[in-house]
Amino acid sequence: MKAVADLNLDRFMGDWYVLADIETPFDRNAVAPLETYKQAPGGVVETTYSYREGSSDGPLRERNLKGFVSDASPAIWGMQIFWPVKAEYRVVYLDDDYQTTIIGRTKRDFVWVMARTPSIDPATFKALLKTVQTLGYDLEKIRIHEPMRSLHATNTTINAKSSDR
């Protein structure tokens, strides 16, 4: 799975709303997840994963992670979930305006579809899901977060599961 070429790490930093994903063991109850990236010295990206637990009015939770940028490409990171494990984290799609992105793994076990805003145009979202499918992911495993879930509800072309998250 190829990472994007010529990623400008400075432009990539900031807030990214998770619109859809394949849930991990660490985010099963996550509602309205947000990833925030901040560059730190030594090729490190400080990552804050925040979300509401269980429902949109659930308690706010936050996890602090570290991304270690690969020497081979700024679009490939080792994301340290807990020491000493670093999970593969690849920016596999990024639009020219740095407004939408797809993060994937060569194992195709997890994927994140993200945007700078909590929701995007349904046609753009559908195209992103199609890209996820083209990358080899099973769309039946995709969890769509609100508010994209409501906007996507009438889509019958792509079969991504909607969840209460």
What are these regions (language model features)?
Residues 1-165:
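A beta-rich soluble binding module of mature secreted/lumenal proteins
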